[in-house]
Amino acid sequence: MHCTVFFLLIACAKSSYGQTRSVSTAKSESKSDEYSYNSDAIDQSRLLRGAVNPVSENMALRKFIFDMPEMLRPEHFEPIFINPAAVKEVIKDYLAYGEALCGSGYDPRLLALFGVRPTVLKQELMKAKGVTLSVMPSSRKRPRALDEVESEVENFRNVLKDFFIPPTTTNPSKLIPDDIETLVPEHVSAHFNSLVYLMYFAVLHFDSQELATMSSSVLLKYALQKNLLLREKIESGTLGEWERDFRLMRVLNVYKSEQT
């Protein structure tokens, strides 16, 4: 009797152990299978949710990053592939080269990246497909600390606030005093000159948003005096393009008054 019970207990234990082991093995194999494709599955689900950039955009961003590895902070390498807003952080650092915000000899295309929304900037990088590299200043200085660059950007914004008032519906014309150059300290003159380049870029691409904040008559007259390319662009623009936007017409009217 006791032997029978003993053997039954052994049989039950073996059966239970076998079932437990098979379930455990199945779970283990299932988990192994899960991990074998988990990365791709996560990437695919993120793509479907829009949590990461499409592959083609990532490729373009990778080219932009790794064609200029010495010019970017290492901590920006990875985030840029995950978060489009990281592009703007990279550009902030990028603008530090060649004293682009406060020096001379910078490319207007480079300055035009200042203050651009991350989504717009990303689109521009996609369209450039490597051409963006041509806006890099010749000076290859070591990048400054990000907080220093951010401070410089903030200073630049403050200069614009101090010496330039955006147009409003109640006061659309008299936005900058005629004697602006006598009011601005000499060390700030480069900042004001940068507005000329931004104005040129805005007109070059018929960017009404840029023109909305820069097309006062005084500033435009200053730009026309300083920049021959701006004159040429206005002269080459078709009337239809200008008539479609009242800001462009404002620029054209100021240009005509400057000619008389």
UniProtKB/Swiss-Prot annotation:
Where can this protein be found? Secreted; Host nucleus
| Keywords recorded for this protein, A-Z | Host nucleus, Secreted, Signal
Q: What is this protein called?
A: RxLR effector protein BLR38
User: Per the record's keyword annotation, is Iron-sulfur included, yes or no?
Assistant: no
Mostly located where?
secreted
State the encoding gene.
BLR38
Q: Where is this motif: RxLR?
A: 46-49
- GO CC terms of this entry: extracellular region; host cell nucleus
Function according to Swiss-Prot or TrEMBL: Secreted effector that triggers a robust hypersensitive response (HR) in Lactuca serriola LS102. The response to BLN06 was visible as strong necrosis. Although effector recognition is frequently associated with single dominant R gene loci, the recognition of BLR38 requires 2 unlinked loci that display incomplete dominance.
Q: Which residues form the signal peptide?
A: 1-18
What is the UniProt domain comment for this protein?
Has the canonical translocation motif RxLR, but lacks the canonical EER motif, which characterizes most oomycete effectors identified so far.
Domain of life per record: Eukaryota
What positions carry the motif Nuclear localuization signal (NLS)? 136-148
Species of the source:
Bremia lactucae
**Stated family:** Belongs to the RxLR effector family.
